[in-house]
Amino acid sequence: EQGYNLNVDLVDDAIGWINRQGSVSPDKPFFVYMAPGAVHAPLHVNQEWIDKFQGQFNQGWDTWREEVFARQLAAGVMPAGTTLSERPHWVPAWDSLSADERRLYSRMMEVYAGFLTHTDAQVGRLVEHVKSLGEFDNTIFVVMSDNGASAEGGPKGSYNEVFFFNFVPESLEENLKRIDLLGTPEAHNHYPWGWA
């Protein structure tokens, strides 16, 4: 269905369930378990969410990992004195990539970031609904993740990760021709492992 998004649908269903449960048993607590599809591949999200990140990853994964690490230190996520590990030898330096590779790989990360942000907004809709019911202070939210960054896209990312899993080579030229399809139902894309 044109415009369909699993995460929107899951939150719509969760909100509907909370409302129905509240109508049937208003004095009983509710339990909702919601497992969004994000941010596993395929990375599908509307263009407006991808556009929010246009150009934000052009500096490349070497600079990006340093910036993220600095933010984590400043926020206390990493203990003071922690040092950033070396980039793995099997991940190429961003500056060693061609301009076309950098353009494609930046775009792949823009799609991922848009998908993650869209998912966060959907979880936010659920939280706002609980607030609108006056149940926010009486609700426990538990957020868990089964994985962190993913290397499923391989060294060069993938227009269709099934290619990666089946050892089918993808060409930079073909993926550049399809760059505008990344994030759409036409693609089953994933970013290169340099971003992981």
Give the predicted meaning of each segment.
Residues 1-196:
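Active-site-proximal cap/lid insertion segments
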